[in-house]
Regions:
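Non-catalytic accessory segments of hydrolases
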Residues: 2-155
């Protein structure tokens, strides 16, 4: 039976709880900006700098609203249905479970023509990279389509 341990890290912004599995730390679904909903829908997001409660970063969160992508299903080993929501500004972090500092950081920007994609796609999860190399890998979601790129500032 595979052992999964909860992992708590303390940051300048607050505490984040993830988990460790097969010597890899996972911190999934960390909010990095305020929710871009309601009156904030077509405005620039505001960076989330601090939080009061521990962030439970143990599972992927909502992905940006987008049309169905047949290729994502084709390249997945199992059916994955992600909740789609305008509240989608989350990042995911993977790193080896060791105490070494000053690791290289890889930040992955997914493609999809600003219409499809998300930072939780199985095809791009970096466990194989992190297992072989002592690096930190970050994926994240960003707003797509009109919700991400329609500029209303002139109106």
């Amino acid at each position: 039976m595979e052992m999964i341990l909860l992992t708590l890290i303390k940051t300048h912004g607050g505490d984040i709880k993830g988990y460790t599995k097969k010597k890899i730390n996972y911190f999934l679904g960390i909010p990095y900006a305020n929710q871009p909903i309601n009156e904030h829908r077509f405005k620039h997001s505001k960076c989330l700098k601090t939080w009061n409660k521990t962030i439970e970063a143990t599972s992927f969160k909502s992905i940006p609203p987008q049309p169905y992508n047949k290729l994502e299903t084709f390249f997945s080993s199992h059916a994955q249905l992600f909740n789609q929501s305008e509240d989608c500004l989350y990042l995911n972090i993977w790193c080896q479970n060791n105490q070494y500092n000053n690791k290289p950081v890889i930040i992955y920007f997914y493609g999809g023509g600003f219409v499809n994609g998300h930072g939780s796609q199985e095809l791009y999860t970096p466990e194989h990279i992190v297992a072989r190399h002592d690096v930190i890998v970050i994926t994240f979601n960003y707003r797509l389509g009109a919700l991400g790129f329609l500029d209303w500032s002139y109106f």
